Structures are given as C-alpha cells and as structure tokens.
Amino acid sequence: MRAAAVQLNSNEDKERNLGIAERLVREAAADGAELVVLPEKFNVLGSSEQLAAGAEPLDGPTLRWAESLARELRLWLVAGSIVETVEQDEKLRNTSALIGPDGSIHAVYRKIHLFDVEVGEMVYRESDVEGPGDEIVVADAGELKLGLAVCYDLRFPELFRIMAVR
C-alpha cells in the first residue's frame, strides 16, 4: 500500500486549513497514495480558547468533510487529529479517526498521553483543557493493520509494543 504523510501549518482558520489539506490529499491521491495521513490538529490549531472554539463532535463538519473526501478519492484517510467535544465532559479530546474508502469511520483513537511538562520556565499542561483517551486502537485498513497514536504518545514505547502484539 502506498502511503503519504501530509504536512501543513494549521492555524485557527478552519476553512483555510481544510482547503489546504484537501489540496494536499488530492495531490497525494493523484500520485498513487492509497493511505493518506493528516497531522495532529490539522483542522484548527491555536490557543486554548481557539481550540475550544474550533472543537466539534465526531459527527461534526471536519470528519464529514474527511468522509466525503475519502469516499470520492477511494482511499484510506487518517484524520490526524481534531479537537473533539465530548458530551457531558468539559474537557476536550485530541482525537484521530481512520476513514475508509467507503467514507465511513473505521476506528477512533483519543490521545492517551497528555503533554504535561515543564521545560525551563515554560509550562505545558494539556490536561488543563483536554482529557485522556483510555483505549489502544489497532484497526484494519484494507490488508494493513494500523495502530493509531498522536504526538506525545510517541514517548511511550509500551503503547507501540502492545499495538505490535495485537
């Protein structure tokens, strides 16, 4: 399976970000990609307030856009991550979705390991606005087994060992 990683400099303008992402996904598909992976928070990136303003449920406009694009281009699409609202929880989630060529969501992963660190005088506390996921996700993407992870999850090798065993 030919795969492509799409990179873009997202900001708080969701419409702009989706336009750029769509152009890049289409370019990857034209180059033969059967699996395209979008980056973390590809649809909206900014301050905590901007993330909250751009957050949406799984059935919101960003994943509907991704489902439509995957269906049209007949490819697997990892919607890198979006900022997800969760019913009855004030905390947001950093959520990745695997969408199939049929345009349906085949797997959903919510980032488990939140980035709460102090680097010199800088303090990062994702847990102030985001809640952790609690499920390790490995899904079928055609003949490929695909483990989903987001950003800081990379620092926890046990997550990937578990995925490999599955």
Locate the predicted segments by residue.
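Active-site catalytic loop in hydrolytic enzyme cores
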Residues: 68, 87-166
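Short, acidic/polar
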Residues: 16-25, 156-162
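Short secondary-structure boundary/capping elements
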Residues: 16, 58-61, 130-131, 155
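Short polar catalytic/cofactor-binding loops
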Residues: 7-14
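Active-site metal-binding loops of divalent metal-dependent hydrolases
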Residues: 8, 41, 154
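Cys-nucleophile CN-hydrolase/nitrilase-fold catalytic domain and related Cys-dependent amidase chemistry
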Residues: 14, 23-102, 106-110
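Glycine- and other small-residue-rich loops at beta-strand/loop junctions that grip anionic moieties
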Residues: 6, 55-56, 149-152
